[in-house]
């Protein structure tokens, strides 16, 4: 399975902060925002990853992440010339995806929860259809919304409806079989001129191959698209890390625990950051 991180967009809701820098490069406590969605792909066992950025930000992402070898993965890059919809990622990434299945994660989404790694690996193991994740929110009109019947089976999906049929939002994490590329090519722009991911999900729903997994108690899904939510996300990460004495979305640790980095490579990377808490945390891992 291949992985795609969509890190484009103009971040207008975060102006003036994002006038000079990509939203996905902003810090969320002690790491760049993009570390969090990248960690999701790595926890799912995905090592071949495409990062799609706005044209003006591509070089900055390359400078931060490189070719991925420091994290035991392979990272390539592409650009989205203009923010024409999430589903456009599959058209941009068609050659990268090839004949593989694909997982798309949005560059400004943060996930945390018990047994999340197991949940991800189960979704990645599916060879047919699509898997998306639903989470209860206070403001469903801001998101794609999934409606369930009395048996809690998905019956409809709408993108940012004025009158939501439920308070279950579809999160920014999607697993698809290889048909996603051809399905995306069939989409027509919505009223707001975008290729909507909800329309793609609806195609899977209509042919009976969409699985909607619930992220319930014990899970946190954080959308960092506003000043308030960005601050809340940083506070959440700080609190969890301080209480549990672990780091969320520590890419080097994930790679090391997955067997993708040797002890020697982890120590080498940690030494370059030994003067801060992040590097010291990596060094402590080697002593346990």
Curated annotation (Swiss-Prot):
Single GO term (MF): glucose-1-phosphate thymidylyltransferase activity
Biological process terms in GO annotation: biosynthetic process
Chain sites annotated for binding Mg(2+): 108, 223
Catalytic activity: dTTP + alpha-D-glucose 1-phosphate + H(+) = dTDP-alpha-D-glucose + diphosphate
SUPFAM superfamilies the UniProt entry points to: Nucleotide-diphospho-sugar transferases
Entries under Pfam families matching the protein: NTP_transferase (PF00483)
Co-factor requirement: Mg(2+)
Cofactor details (free text): Binds 1 Mg(2+) ion per subunit.
Alphabetic keyword roster: Magnesium, Metal-binding, Nucleotidyltransferase, Transferase
Transmembrane segments: none
Entry-linked CDD domains: G1P_TT_short
InterPro entries in the cross-refs: G1P_thy_trans_s, NTP_transferase_dom, Nucleotide-diphossugar_trans
Family (UniProt): Belongs to the glucose-1-phosphate thymidylyltransferase family.
Self-association state and partner proteins as the record states: Homotetramer.
Function: Catalyzes the formation of dTDP-glucose, from dTTP and glucose 1-phosphate, as well as its pyrophosphorolysis.
Protein's UniProt name: Glucose-1-phosphate thymidylyltransferase
Protein's organism: Neisseria meningitidis serogroup A / serotype 4A (strain DSM 15465 / Z2491)
